[in-house]
UniProtKB/Swiss-Prot annotation:
Transmembrane segments: none annotated. This is 6,7-dimethyl-8-ribityllumazine synthase. It is an enzyme of class 2 (transferase). The keyword Transferase applies.
Length: 162
């Protein structure tokens, strides 16, 4: 049995962080956490680019363009959708999730999602590093691991049909 796994060593990886400006009190903390996680896993600061878009709904379009450049091994989407009094929360959350998943399926690189979908600002801040860890950092670490597993798959020897 051959096992292919990604490592959490990001040395030599090029990464992009795509961050929504809306709910910036939360998204800036996600960005700080993601950048710190990349650094801790060996990705050089000079190998990380940050792209900002207006809101979380716009993330998939920007992700698609960033991925299409072919310059990155790992791309991380960062945003926050906070429930309000209308069904807008459900629509945005669902469409962003579908959009990021679609980009990830078609990408030739690792694409991960650090988008919070929370019931309150307090809950979002907790998940952005105040109490419950930083989901931006988690998404960045997952991107490093995913980039490495994709590299391992690309290097795997071809098997002859029996």
């Amino acid at each position: 049995m051959n096992v292919y796994e990604g490592s959490l060593v990001g040395t030599g990886l090029k990464a992009a962080l795509v961050v929504a400006r809306f709910n910036s009190l939360v998204t800036e903390q996600l960005l700080v956490g993601a950048a710190d996680a990349l650094r801790r896993h060996g990705v050089a600061d000079g190998d990380v680019d940050v792209f900002r878009c207006p809101g979380t709904f716009e993330l998939p379009a920007v992700l698609r363009r960033v991925v299409a450049t072919g310059r990155y091994d790992a791309v991380v989407a960062l945003g926050a959708v906070i429930r309000g009094g209308t069904p807008h929360f459900e629509y945005v959350s669902a469409e962003v999730t579908k959009g990021v998943a679609h980009v990830a399926m078609e990408a030739g690189c690792a694409v991960t999602m650090g988008v919070l979908t929370c019931d309150s600002m307090e809950q979002a801040l907790e998940r952005a590093g105040v109490k419950a860890g930083n989901k931006g950092a988690d998404a960045a670490a997952a991107a490093v691991e995913q980039a490495n597993v994709l590299r391992a798959i690309a290097r795997a020897p071809a098997r002859k049909a029996e």
